[in-house]
Amino acid sequence: MRIGVLTAGGDCPGLNAVIRSVVHRAVDNYGDEVIGFEDGYAGLLDGRYRALDLNAVSGILARGGTILGSSRLERDRLREACENAGDMIQNFGIDALIPIGGEGTLTAARMLSDAGLPVVGVPKTIDNDISSTDRTFGFDTAVGVATEAMDRLKTTAESHQRVMVVEVMGRHAGWIALESGMAAGAHGICLPERPFDPADLVKMVEERFSRGKKFAVVCVAEGAHPAEGSMDYGKGAIDKFGHERFQGIGTALAFELERRLGKEAKPVILGHVQRGGVPTAYDRVLATRFGWHAVEAAHRGDFGRMTALRGTDVVMVPLAEAVTELKTVPKDRMDEAESVF
């Protein structure tokens, strides 16, 4: 069997662990040939790929990013790929394609599968927002990075009696903000799933200061937004990939809190530091398991599906099921977090 693998969309820790696992399982166990398309679906369309053998994946388990490169594909080019799916199978001689990516990548994978490509998807995203899987690799690392940042910021906030507003990633799902905020003991958490009122945060800070706790840390997801009429804040434009560009809720909220409280409030935007660096042990293991099961699925002819974690088991689920809707933070998880503010 000849297997093609690619990484697309935003990078995250653990991608190389999947690539390594695919190569080891395919080559060692089945004697397969594995090729890696460069820069995601763009490499698939442009015919840019390289052979992946055991030497090519040596030493990459703990490396962040992706040795294959990644990119986002514009919608016109995706349509082009679907229209030429049959030609791509013939030109590259691939018997299976394993795209590793988030919601956008898996949506494209579903379209390519519907067009006739033998596809087995592997979900990744630091946002943990893909339906049908309990966890995605990359998420654990991102939560750890955000938690450590807030742990560090608490000391400087306390020293200067400041309010620190820490903005983390999460356009439409607030999983990183929820879990890192809980782990770091943030005093307020703002999620995309529930509009917030700055007045509640002002009250929280004032109550803390009245008890002699003269600092506060607020964790806010980039997609969080204030309740209508509670503060001035505008949403951003849509980029060419269909993603909303946010205007910086962390900065806007810090300004609003400083204005209302008369106390110094500092925004800290973690940004892409959450995507980089060494993956945690958990993410390495999950990514490795996903790669193993993707190869097994390909050899069973179990196409049009993706790997997923259910409890402690890795199972295969239809791509259509995985991309129907985003997995957002449910009310009970928000209530749990609020109980320890």
UniProtKB/Swiss-Prot annotation:
Entry binding sites for Mg(2+): 103
Keyword Hydrolase carried by entry: no
Task of the protein: Catalyzes the phosphorylation of D-fructose 6-phosphate to fructose 1,6-bisphosphate by ATP, the first committing step of glycolysis.
Self-association and partners: Homodimer or homotetramer.
Annotated site residues (Important for substrate specificity) in this chain: 104
Enzyme Commission no: 2.7.1.11
GO terms of molecular function: 6-phosphofructokinase activity; ATP binding; diphosphate-fructose-6-phosphate 1-phosphotransferase activity; fructose-6-phosphate binding; metal ion binding
Activity vs pH: Optimum pH is 7.5-8.
InterPro entries: ATP_PFK, ATP_PFK_prok-type, Phosphofructokinase_CS, Phosphofructokinase_dom, Phosphofructokinase_III, PKF_sf
First-level EC class: transferase
GO CC annotation terms, alphabetical: 6-phosphofructokinase complex
GO biological process: canonical glycolysis; fructose 1,6-bisphosphate metabolic process; fructose 6-phosphate metabolic process
Reported consequences of knocking out the gene: Accumulates glucose 6-phosphate and fructose 6-phosphate. Has an increased carbon flux through the pentose phosphate pathway, resulting in a higher production of the pigmented antibiotics actinorhodin and undecylprodigiosin.
Binding residues for substrate: 125-127, 162, 169-171, 222, 266, 272-275
The protein's name in its UniProt record: ATP-dependent 6-phosphofructokinase 2
Family: Belongs to the phosphofructokinase type A (PFKA) family. Mixed-substrate PFK group III subfamily.
